[in-house]
C-alpha cells in the first residue's frame, strides 16, 4: 500500500464549514488526490452531519484514544468522497453541538479538551489502520498538537519513524490559547513546556505546538508568510516563527472552480463566461435578478453595485465600509452586505438599510447560494480587510468578473493586479483607512462609468486568472518532495 498524505482538520466542506478553512480543506486534499497523491482526511463528526447524505458508515467501533489514566474511546465513521477516504471522529459529548467552536455566549469552555481528544483520536486511528502515513498535514490550532505528538512519538515508536509533518497556518490570530493546567492532560512530555515549545506567556498554545514541532510550516500566501515574521502581523508568535523561518513557506491557496465558476454555477439564473459570444449579457441578467431578489431599485441595473461578503468583524474591515456608506450613496451606487459577526456591526448595517432602503441591502447571516448570486450580480467586490492571510472571496470575485477593491495585504496583494497597471484585475489601497478605501472605490466607480471598453477588458483579464488548486497543488508536491516523498 502506498503511504498517504493525511490531512487533519476541524472543518471540511461539504461536511462542515464555518469559513475559509472549510472551503480550503474541501478542495485541497481532493485536488492532490486527483493529481495522483494518495490522500485521506480526518475530521470531527459534528452533530449536524447526517450519515445518509454522503454514504457515511461506521468503520471502527470503540477506537481507544490512548489516555493511560482513562480508557476513553471514540467511533470512527468513513465516507468515500470522490474516491478519497474521509474519516470522522465521533464522540457525542465533544462534537454533537449546534456550532463548532462557540455559541452566542462565547467559546465553548472545553475547547482545549475537545481538540486534544481530536488530535489524539487522529493519531490512534492511524495506528489502528496499520500503515504509517508519509505526511501528516495539520491545519490551524485545532490540529496543532498532531505535529507535536509525531515529533516526540517517533523518537520511541518505530511506527512513526519515517512520517513527516506539515503545519498550515490559515489565520495566526486564532491560536488555541488555554490555561497552563490543561497541558498536563494533553499527553506531551514535560520537556515540551518551554518557550521554544508549547508555552506562551504562561499559557498552553496549541497553534504554537504545531509551529514549534512540525517539519515544515506553511501559510496560505507568500505575502502573509513575510508579514507574520514581524510584530504588526505576528500576533505574538513572530519570535517562534523567526526561529522556524528556514522551514516556513508561503503557498497561495487555490479556488475550487468546480464550485465557484459562473459558466457552470447551479445557483445562478444565467450562466456566463469570459469568452461568451454575447459578451457579459449573462452577468447583466444575473445583476437584474439579484436586484429583484433583494428588493433593490431596478434603476441600479445601470449603476455600479458593490458587494461585500464576509464576517462582520474588525478583521474584515466592515466598519470601514459602514463609515463611508453615506458618501457612497451620494454617488448613486448600490451596496449589498452579506455576513454575520459583531452584534454592533450587524445592527449598524441594518440601520443603514432602513435609511437607504432600495439602494442598500444588508443580510445578517450566510447562505451559500446567495453568496454565489452576489458574486455574479455585483459589479465591484469590496474586501477592506485589516489583514488577510489569503482570502478566497476575492479569487471568486475575479472568476465571476467582479473586480475587487481591496487592502494591499497578505493574499490580496498576491492575487490582485492593481489599477492603473495595464494588466490590472482590480483596485487596492495601502492601509486600513476609510478615506483611502473610499478613494479606491471612487476610482473603480469612475472607471466603470467612463471607460466601458477598459472595464470589460479588466473583467476579462480577471476571469482568466488561474488560482486553481491544481496550480497550488504543484507547490505542495514540491514541499512534500523536500520532506523526502516524491508523489509525481
Swiss-Prot record:
The keyword Transferase applies. InterPro entries: GS/SS, Starch_synth_cat_dom. Keywords: Glycogen biosynthesis, Glycosyltransferase, Transferase. CDD domains: GT5_Glycogen_synthase_DULL1-like. Its EC number is 2.4.1.21. It is an enzyme of class 2 (transferase). Pathway: Glycan biosynthesis; glycogen biosynthesis. Synthesizes alpha-1,4-glucan chains using ADP-glucose. HAMAP family: Glycogen_synth. Belongs to the glycosyltransferase 1 family. Bacterial/plant glycogen synthase subfamily. This is Glycogen synthase. It comes from Nitratidesulfovibrio vulgaris (strain DSM 19637 / Miyazaki F).
Amino acid at each position: 500500500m502506498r503511504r498517504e498524505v493525511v490531512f487533519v482538520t476541524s472543518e471540511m466542506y461539504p461536511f462542515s464549514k464555518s469559513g475559509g478553512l472549510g472551503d480550503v480543506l474541501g478542495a485541497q486534499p481532493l485536488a492532490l488526490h486527483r493529481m495522483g497523491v494518495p490522500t485521506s482526511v480526518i475530521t470531527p463528526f459534528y452533530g449536524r452531519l447526517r450519515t445518509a447524505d454522503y454514504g457515511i458508515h461506521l468503520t471502527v467501533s470503540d477506537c481507544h484514544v490512548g489516555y493511560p489514566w482513562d480508557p476513553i474511546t471514540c467511533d470512527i465513521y468513513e465516507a468515500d468522497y470522490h474516491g478519497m477516504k474521509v474519516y470522522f471522529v465521533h464522540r457525542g459529548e465533544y462534537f454533537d453541538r449546534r456550532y463548532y467552536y462557540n455559541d452566542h455566549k462565547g467559546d465553548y469552555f472545553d475547547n482545549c479538551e475537545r481538540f486534544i481528544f481530536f488530535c489524539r483520536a487522529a493519531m490512534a486511528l492511524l495506528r489502528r489502520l496499520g500503515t504509517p502515513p508519509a505526511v501528516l498535514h495539520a491545519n490551524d490550532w485545532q490540529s496543532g498538537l498532531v505535529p507535536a505528538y509525531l515529533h516526540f512519538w517517533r523518537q520511541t515508536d518505530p511506527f512513526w519513524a519515517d512520517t513527516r509533518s506539515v503545519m498550515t497556518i490559515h489565520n495566526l490570530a486564532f491560536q488555541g490559547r488555554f490555561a497552563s493546567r490543561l497541558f498536563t492532560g494533553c499527553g506531551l512530555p514535560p520537556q515540551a513546556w518551554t518557550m521554544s515549545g508549547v508555552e506562551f506567556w504562561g499559557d498552553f498554545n496549541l497553534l504554537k505546538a504545531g509551529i514549534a514541532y512540525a517539519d515544515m510550516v506553511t501559510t496560505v500566501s507568500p505575502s502573509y508568510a513575510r508579514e507574520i515574521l514581524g510584530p504588526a502581523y505576528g500576533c505574538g508568535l513572530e519570535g517562534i516563527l523567526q526561529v522556524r523561518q528556514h522551514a516556513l513557506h508561503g503557498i497561495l491557496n487555490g479556488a475550487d472552480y468546480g464550485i465557484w465558476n459562473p459558466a457552470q454555477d447551479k445557483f445562478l439564473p444565467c450562466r456566463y463566461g469570459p469568452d461568451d459570444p454575447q459578451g457579459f449579457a449573462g452577468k447583466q441578467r444575473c445583476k437584474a435578478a439579484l436586484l429583484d431578489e433583494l428588493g433593490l431599485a431596478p434603476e441600479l441595473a445601470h449603476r455600479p453595485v458593490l458587494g461585500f461578503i464576509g464576517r462582520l468583524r474588525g478583521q474584515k474591515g466592515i466598519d470601514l465600509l459602514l463609515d463611508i456608506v453615506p458618501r457612497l450613496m451620494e454617488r448613486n451606487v448600490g451596496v449589498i452586505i452579506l455576513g454575520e459577526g459583531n452584534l454592533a456591526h450587524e445592527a449598524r448595517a441594518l440601520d443603514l438599510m432602513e435609511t437607504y432602503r432600495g439602494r442598500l441591502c444588508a443580510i445578517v447571516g450566510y447562505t451559500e447560494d446567495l453568496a454565489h448570486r452576489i458574486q455574479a450580480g455585483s459589479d465591484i467586490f469590496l474586501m477592506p480587510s485589516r489583514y488577510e492571510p489569503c482570502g478566497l472571496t476575492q479569487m471568486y470575485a475575479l472568476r465571476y468578473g467582479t473586480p475587487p477593491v481591496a487592502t494591499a495585504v497578505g493574499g490580496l496583494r498576491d492575487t490582485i493586479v492593481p489599477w492603473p497597471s495595464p494588466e490590472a484585475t482590480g483596485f487596492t489601497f495601502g492601509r486600513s483607512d476609510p478615506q483611502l478605501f473610499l478613494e479606491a472605490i471612487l476610482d473603480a466607480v469612475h472607471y466603470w462609468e467612463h471607460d466601458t471598453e477598459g472595464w470589460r477588458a479588466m473583467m476579462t483579464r480577471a476571469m482568466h486568472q488561474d488560482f486553481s488548486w491544481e496550480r497550488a497543488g504543484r507547490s505542495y508536491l514540491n514541499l512534500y518532495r523536500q520532506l523526502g516523498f516524491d508523489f509525481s
